Amino acid sequence: MAALQTLREWIGIQQFPPATQSKLLEILGKYKEEDVSSLTVLVMGKGGVGKSSTVNSVIGEKAAAVSTFQSEGLRPTLVSRTRSGFTLNIIDTPGLIEGGYVNDQAINIIKRFLLNMTIDVLLYVDRLDVYRVDDLDRQVVGAITDAFGKEIWKKSALVLTHAQFSPPDGLNYNHFVSKRSNALLKVIQTGAQLKKQDLQGFSIPVILVENSGRCHKNESDEKILPCGTSWIPNLFNKITEISFNGNKAIHVDKKLVEGPNPNERGKKLIPLMFAFQYLLVMKPLVRAIKSDVSRESKPAWELRDSGLASRRS
């Protein structure tokens, strides 16, 4: 379980330009209107995709350690900030791939870290400037689904970092973004085993992010995407939409962390085992015994006694 932390005032918001601050405070006002006092955002994905950098960009300070040339640690980081009575919790997690495979130990550590917490939003992070998806992507999505259930994807967004990216060979930027996004969304759909009925009434939003210092800015000094969108307020807007989308948040209880109790599962199987034994073993055996008894010839004394009885009658 995550260690309790002393709540810190969200002073990083003051590092944003006034235009961004104004938009963020307006978004926080929506939570106040709905009488919501806290929000918990879980950030997951492979290593090296920009999870920690995104957390720092959102908070406006270096709250999560960024390890560019070193392997990530296994322990998640909880970053909590409060502003005007509202608490924002962001959980930065380690990469889920180790040696070309999903790191089950990392998954288990994350689950135990989240014990008794409620996930309001999942940010699944990957890079925009990657040209293909592979089986590892499906494995990561499958591992997240196995850990928290497929319903978590109804509270999720796909975040693509390195958005200040020039596609090769003169490809149209919007076309490349659409192609990359659709490829990853398809991986999420197949990896999470989402059926058509699961997808009715909701879609996973795609959010572009640029964490580097070379991110372009508008006349209000806000960091913008190539399309001109101020991406930090846009990210907060999408998070807010997801938190209020009507789907249930994911509560991480002991059952979710440890899985079903094998003893309870065994108790449920006992009646089935007895029924199976009776139908396939005992019942045919009893039937066979009765059949043998009926076919067995009667002894002489029984025939004599039955003959005397018939003459007397």
From Swiss-Prot:
**Source species of the chain:** Arabidopsis thaliana (Mouse-ear cress)
Q: What region holds the AIG1-type G domain? A: 36-260
Where in this protein would one find the motif AKR2A-binding sequence (ABS) required for chloroplast outer envelope membrane targeting, according to its record?
Answer: 287-295
Q: In which tissues or organs does this protein occur?
A: Mostly expressed in roots and flowers, and, to a lower extent, in seedlings, stems, and leaves.
Entry annotated with the keyword Glycosyltransferase: no
* Cofactor or coenzyme needed: Mg(2+)
Classification via PROSITE patterns: G_AIG1 (PS51720)
Residues annotated as binding GTP? 48-53, 67-72, 162, 210-211
Q: What is this protein called?
A: Translocase of chloroplast 34, chloroplastic
Kindly indicate whether the keyword Acetylation belongs to this entry.
Answer: yes
**What does the sequence similarity comment in the record state about its family?**
Belongs to the TRAFAC class TrmE-Era-EngA-EngB-Septin-like GTPase superfamily. AIG1/Toc34/Toc159-like paraseptin GTPase family. TOC34 subfamily.
Q: Where are residues bearing N-acetylalanine located in the sequence?
A: 2
Q: Note the InterPro entries from the entry.
A: G_AIG1, GIMA/IAN/Toc, P-loop_NTPase, Toc34
**Mind listing the GO molecular function terms for this protein?**
GTP binding; GTPase activity; identical protein binding; metal ion binding; protein-transporting ATPase activity
Location of the region described as G5 in the Swiss-Prot/TrEMBL record = 210-212
What turns on this gene?
Induced in light but repressed in darkness.
Chain segments annotated as transmembrane: 269-286
Lineage, highest ranks first: Eukaryota, Viridiplantae, Streptophyta, Embryophyta, Tracheophyta
Alphabetical UniProt keywords: Acetylation, Chloroplast, GTP-binding, Hydrolase, Magnesium, Membrane, Metal-binding, Nucleotide-binding, Plastid, Plastid outer membrane, Protein transport, Receptor, Transmembrane, Transmembrane helix, Transport
User: What EC number(s) does its UniProt record assign?
Assistant: 3.6.5.-
Q: What ranges does the record give for the region G1, renumbered to this chain?
A: 45-52
The entry describes its oligomerization and partners as: Homodimer, heterodimer with TOC33, and monomer. Part of the TOC core complex that includes 1 protein for the specific recognition of transit peptides surrounded by a ring composed of four proteins forming translocation channels, and four to five GTP-binding proteins providing energy. This core complex can interact with components of the TIC complex to form a larger import complex. Chloroplastic protein precursor such as prSS (precursor of the RuBisCO small subunit) interacts with these complexes.
